[in-house]
Curated annotation (Swiss-Prot):
Name assigned to this protein: Cysteine--tRNA ligase
Note accompanying the cofactor annotation: Binds 1 zinc ion per subunit.
GO MF term set: ATP binding; cysteine-tRNA ligase activity; zinc ion binding
UniProt xrefs under HAMAP family: Cys_tRNA_synth (MF_00041)
Length: 493
């Protein structure tokens, strides 16, 4: 099946044809580091991590850029309110964002430029727009420079709006505009703002406008044209509309695809700081492991609204428990499979490293139905259905002692988990190789002792060992191929 994505600009699902064969260039909007991250930021980053992983799986060499907006009206206002330096506040929250991303196993981008590190590129873009008649310095001497929206006939094409129906640009204290919808490319310094938050320019000391920052950084790292621009649905207008307008007005084709992820709701209600229902990473990770959180954030179609509730994390944990239970039982059985062609025992790489085989994922074993789902506008819900159906089939293979079929299902599940980024994070059962290897050694010793008791028909001793392990949270399951074990998951409240 051809790889296809929904393009916001054309409002249709289109075949993905990269600008350069075999390569895919992506830019997605990172954080404005004014305060701590929340669940919406995490979902957006995760969606584009899934996209990047899938493009790589399909053989594309990816170049990913995610910006950091480290200078902005809100950053200045909140820093002043808190009595701290704006740059210190920005850096502090940038680190918090990265820590949350890392915890979720979100791959770092190839480039992560800060707005403050690309001022000269912004000056060049502004001057180009002025020279082309699409921007103008404010006539009041304020140092502001604005984009002239009526000079660009395609303004509104991304969000399919008529210019006269649009809201006024929400620039703080706008000065000297021709049209209320004109937006700031450069903001002249105001007397109450710190001198450290301004840079010299041909139009006077000041700082860049938010929309301009992204266009300049895209041009620097990906060139005038690139494959995919991504971000949250709330960024379509005005941010992405303005990005596209100013870039194309400067003669840059810009993005070939625009992809937007849906927002996160709280039990059906829009999340809002004023309501007090915004969920941060600290609260999420207190309720569930990073792997469970990743499963939850990534399980819905990326364009749909994701609804949050404590129960949704419990459901995600239960879904992963079913997968992990299969892997534990299958791992013990798969090691017994003799590979017919080679005549030696099949053993997954690192299988002797406790749960090391969670990281084993031969991509060639990914089921065709899974590939078709992911190719179809990154349909993760459908792909997860394939994953869970494979788990069910694998459990049936265990029950029927069909070890050859079990091996196939085992490899397929590992492959799908790897693609979804669910095998790259330490599992709840395996925080690190050292501790899990020790745990497995201890449990296996007890199981051997139990098996000896069963051989001697000492059923009381066998049950006693089983009960002792159960008390420690170890669940034992007996089958014709021997006993297997897993950690009994407790519901997190």
């Amino acid at each position: 099946m051809t790889l296809r994505f929904y393009d916001t600009a054309t409002a249709e699902v289109r075949d993905f044809a990269p600008l350069v064969e075999g390569k895919a260039s992506l830019y997605y909007c990172g954080a404005t580091v004014q305060s701590e991250p929340h669940i919406g930021h995490l979902r957006s980053a995760l969606v584009f991590d899934q996209l990047t992983r899938w493009l790589q799986f399909r053989g594309f060499q990816t170049t990913v850029v995610r910006n950091v907006t480290d200078i902005d009206d809100k950053i200045l206002a909140k820093a002043a309110e808190a009595g701290e330096e704006w740059w210190a506040r920005a850096y502090k929250y940038e680190q918090q964002f990265n820590a949350a991303y890392d915890k979720l196993g979100i791959t770092r981008p190839d480039y992560e430029p800060r707005a403050t590190g690309n001022i000269s590129e912004m000056h060049s873009l502004i001057q180009d727009l002025i020279d082309r008649g699409h921007a103008y310095p404010a006539p009041d001497g304020s140092g502001d420079v604005y984009f002239d929206v009526r000079s660009w006939g395609k303004y509104g094409s991304l969000t399919h709006q008529n210019i006269d129906d649009m809201q006024a640009a929400a620039d703080a204290d706008p000065r000297g505009k021709k049209d209320a919808r004109d937006f700031a490319l450069w903001k002249g310094r105001k007397p109450e703002e710190p001198t450290t938050a301004s840079w010299p320019s041909p139009w006077g000391a000041g700082r860049p406008g938010w929309h301009l920052e992204c266009s300049a950084m895209v041009g620097k790292y990906l060139g005038d044209a690139f494959d995919i621009h991504g971000g949250g649905l709330d960024l379509r207008f005005p941010h992405h509309e303005n990005e596209m307008a100013q870039s194309q007005a400067a003669g840059r084709p810009f993005a070939n695809f625009w992809m937007h992820n849906g927002l996160v709701a709280y039990q059906g209600e829009k999340m809002s700081k004023s309501i007090g229902n915004v969920i941060g990473p600290g609260e999420l990770f207190a309720q569930a492991s990073p792997r469970v959180v990743r499963y939850y954030l990534g399980q819905a179609h990326y364009r749909s609204v994701l609804d949050y509730s404590p129960e949704s994390l419990e459901e995600a944990a239960a879904a992963l428990a079913r997968i992990d239970g299969f892997l534990v039982n299958a791992g013990a059985n798969v090691q017994r499979v003799e590979v017919e062609d080679s005549g030696h025992m099949y053993l997954p790489p690192a299988a002797k490293q406790g749960f090391g085989w969670f990281a084993y994922a031969p991509l060639s074993d990914t089921p065709a139905a899974f590939v078709e789902a992911m190719d179809d506008d990154l349909n993760v819900p459908k792909a997860l259905a394939v994953l869970h159906e494979t788990v069910r089939a694998g459990n049936s293979a265990i029950a029927s002692s069909d070890l050859v079929e079990l091996q196939k299902k085992f490899e397929a599940v590992l492959a799908m988990l790897d693609v979804l980024g669910l095998s790259s994070i330490a599992t709840d059962q395996a925080a690190d190789n050292g501790s899990t290897h020790a745990l497995e050694t201890l449990v296996q010793t007890r199981l051997q002792e139990r098996q000896q008791a069963r051989t001697e028909k000492n059923w009381a001793r066998s049950d006693e060992i089983r009960d002792e392990l159960a008390e420690a949270g170890i669940k034992i399951e007996d089958s014709s191929n021997g006993a297997t074990w897993s950690i009994e998951r407790k519901q997190q409240r």
